[in-house]
């Protein structure tokens, strides 16, 4: 009813309105069927290659317990049962009014109409008819469209608390790792480790590479956790999920990697003095601590930055994961294609890392300039490597129209402010009392510039100009007067429930064709075995010699093989090229005449 009311209001502008269904349960059933179908394909191919032995297995945990069953019959029965549930669930989604969510995708016959609708208030009641730009079809995260609107604020509040706790939970192991740089403190706490620490190789390893390596291990699983948190918040597009996850990851790295490394290095030496000093002395303390951590950040750039770029171009991690999947998970060609999928570039993880290196470059440009060559080398190789990977390796999941740039601009401004505070603290340690107050103008000018850019240029990333929309509409009408937009856009935002149903029908037809091919081959195999047995009995009943009997049997076998291959060729030609393409290899079971399947 809500969608009909909206359609009545916008009849002169919109082309189509596509409702959003709460089909999350249906999608889970489809994924479950895909897993079962994959196992069925695996056992059918296995039996196709060795028809003399039916695949037998147990139904319990990982096939180690439970009753023994025929795997092909077992998975066919489970898929048949699941098909009934899918049909019932699909009918429920299409017929139940509660399954229709108060969300819809509206397509317009012009860019101007879409811009007016998306960027204006539709109702005098501010809580009704909320409109916004829809993400492109590839960018839609359909699962979160079913989340009620009133629960989004609660979810975001709870996730904010969880992120805050996560940041300070990770502070504990990172602080311990950074304290390893102070070997004298470790020797005081654990005197029995002194003989090991005094070894030159161990000492250089602990002071040089271990802190950076341990920090990288701690940060390895973090992007996945932050992406899950962003999904719980309820964002409805993949680009929004990656932007939120990238924002969380940047705050985490700023607090733990940058500030945490600096504070931990000094807090273990002067913990009480640091926390009991007045706030005016904190910039001075940080200004003293940051130059002392330059060596650590040099090793961190080499371990994480340089080695990370080399690992990116070599793709060692995806290569290892692919071979592990190929050994333990891959069963069919479909599994192999999924294992070989390179995925996307992962902006939620890579973008905050680049912003952290940019922060280090700005902070240490004045404090410790010797760190700048490490940063410059990293960005030079990163530009070449990531450019190559984006063009030739990774898949593009969506197009967000530079939606990430406002966040990147804000991070650059924040890095400038941190560098100003650091320089202010460093100058105060050098007793430059007359020149230090002049540095106050630097953060003020930076904040003014940020506000100016935000008010002037940010709307270009958030809104679509009506002038440009009108120009493109007129150009399109002139260059393509016969363009049928409705037929072009009618399935653009079609709910996945319909695509899944079509794929389900296609897979069912393919499964039936595979079963028919296997059954026909099995029937022909039985006929060939029976024919050989009859000919053998006739030969034994005759009065021929033994030598003649063997010669006659060889001729009969050769003729039988030739006849079977002719029949096989005719059968595949009749099924067409699509049927032969589904089979990864010819049916080798025709040569196993000894045992009945």
Model-derived features with residue positions:
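Transmembrane transport/permeation module of multi-pass membrane proteins
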Residues: 1-532, 538-542, 548-549, 553, ...
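Intrinsic disorder/low-complexity segments
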Residues: 557-558
């Amino acid at each position: 009813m809500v969608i009909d009311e909206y359609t009545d209001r916008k009849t002169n502008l919109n082309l189509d309105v596509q409702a959003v269904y709460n089909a999350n349960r249906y999608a889970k059933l489809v994924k479950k069927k895909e897993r079962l179908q994959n196992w069925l394909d695996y056992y059918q191919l296995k039996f196709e290659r060795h028809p003399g032995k039916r695949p037998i297995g147990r139904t319990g945990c990982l096939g180690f317990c439970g009753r023994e069953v025929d795997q092909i019959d077992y998975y066919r029965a489970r898929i048949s049962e699941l098909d009934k549930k899918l049909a019932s669930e699909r009918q429920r989604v299409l017929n139940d009014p509660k399954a229709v969510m108060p969300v819809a995708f509206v397509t317009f016959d012009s860019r101007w109409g879409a811009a007016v609708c998306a960027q204006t208030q539709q109702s005098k009641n501010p809580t009704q008819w909320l409109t916004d730009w829809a993400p492109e079809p590839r960018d839609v995260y359909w699962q979160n469209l079913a989340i009620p609107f009133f629960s989004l604020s609660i979810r975001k509040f709870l996730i904010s608390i969880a992120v805050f706790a996560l940041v300070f939970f990770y502070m504990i192991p990172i602080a311990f790792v950074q304290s390893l740089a102070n070997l004298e403190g470790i020797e005081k706490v654990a005197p029995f480790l002194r003989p090991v620490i005094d070894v030159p190789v161990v000492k250089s390893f602990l002071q040089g590479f271990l802190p950076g390596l341990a920090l990288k291990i701690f940060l390895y699983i973090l992007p996945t956790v932050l992406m899950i948190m962003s999904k719980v918040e309820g964002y409805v597009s993949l680009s929004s999920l990656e932007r939120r996850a990238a924002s969380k990851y940047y705050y985490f790295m700023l607090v733990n990697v940058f500030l945490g490394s600096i504070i931990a290095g000094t807090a273990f030496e002067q913990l009480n003095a640091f926390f009991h000093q007045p706030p005016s002395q904190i910039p001075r303390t940080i200004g003293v601590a940051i130059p002392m951590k330059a060596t650590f950040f040099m090793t961190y750039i080499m371990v994480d930055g340089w080695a990370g770029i080399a690992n990116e171009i070599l793709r060692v991690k995806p290569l290892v994961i692919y071979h592990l999947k190929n050994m333990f998970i891959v069963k069919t060609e479909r599994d192999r294609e999924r294992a070989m999928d390179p995925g996307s570039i992962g902006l939620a993880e890579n973008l905050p890392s680049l912003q952290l290196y940019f922060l280090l470059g700005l902070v240490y440009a004045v404090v410790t300039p010797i760190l700048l060559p490490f940063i410059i080398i990293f960005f030079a190789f990163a530009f070449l490597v990531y450019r190559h990977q984006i063009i030739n390796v990774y898949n593009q999941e969506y197009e967000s129209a530079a939606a990430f740039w406002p966040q990147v601009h804000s991070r650059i401004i924040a890095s400038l402010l941190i560098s100003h505070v650091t320089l202010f603290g460093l100058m105060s340690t050098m007793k430059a009392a007359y020149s230090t107050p002049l540095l106050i103008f630097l953060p003020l000018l930076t904040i003014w510039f940020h506000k100016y850019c935000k008010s002037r240029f940010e709307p270009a990333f958030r809104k679509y100009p009506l002038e440009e929309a009108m120009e493109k509409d007129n150009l399109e009408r002139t260059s393509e007067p016969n363009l049928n937009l409705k037929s072009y856009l009618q399935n653009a935002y079609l709910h996945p429930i319909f695509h899944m149903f079509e794929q389900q029908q296609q897979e069912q037809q393919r499964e039936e064709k595979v079963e028919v091919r296997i059954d026909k081959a099995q029937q022909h195999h039985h006929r060939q075995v029976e024919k050989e047995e009859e000919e053998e009995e006739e030969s034994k009943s005759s009065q021929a010699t033994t030598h003649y009997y063997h010669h006659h049997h060889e001729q009969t076998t050769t003729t039988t093989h030739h006849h079977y291959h002719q029949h096989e060729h005719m059968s595949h030609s009749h099924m067409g090229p699509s049927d032969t393409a589904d089979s990864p290899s010819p049916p080798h079971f025709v040569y196993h005449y000894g045992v009945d399947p």
